[in-house]
Amino acid sequence: MLIFATMGFNFIRDYLKHRITAKTRHGTHSPFVYKLTDEVIYDFKPKSIYILLETLRKKLSNDALIQGKGTLARNNSRRLDQLIYRIAKDHRPVHIVELENASEVTTAYLAASYASVKEGETALKEVSGTVDLLYIGSCKTGALLMDYFYTYLPRFHAGSLMMVKGIYTNEEIKASWKEIKAHERVTVTVDLFWIGLVYFRKGQAKEHFKIKI
């Protein structure tokens, strides 16, 4: 119980620190990230696909499968899935690979972005050539996250995007997130607290952003 309580405290501390230090669209000096924030991350307009997929969520009673830290994380499941959908759709990927995802609703949102979604460890064999979007759900260890990163790194191209859910899950994951940010092929990262975005854009200065959502 003491360990659980400490983990809970650390998570809340990280959340509050992120809220204090993160910027809005107006605090970014990158045209790419400003547009992403303004037109995608902060696009809160209702969409017909939301109605369909939230009906699916109710049918599956999927909230029990959402990986998170307490009520605050569970209450964000709907908003986070819709954010993932918007980012994926804006990115226009042809091939998406998803790993460590326990949520059927998240899979449905990814599939709705008009991509060919592959699941699980067989995905690398099934997807030939490059991977446009890699979605990694809630990894339990930093070693597993880094294993996925380095396994798929040869498949990433300049237009690829890696989405990592739960980048503040524990100290291991936070350390792995820092290692990913420092990698020479990574040019832009966007820390949305609940999820991290990793870009490999060529010709762009290395920058890291924390955006408030």
Predicted feature residues:
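A short alpha-helical cap/connector motif
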Residues: 1-135, 139-161, 167-213
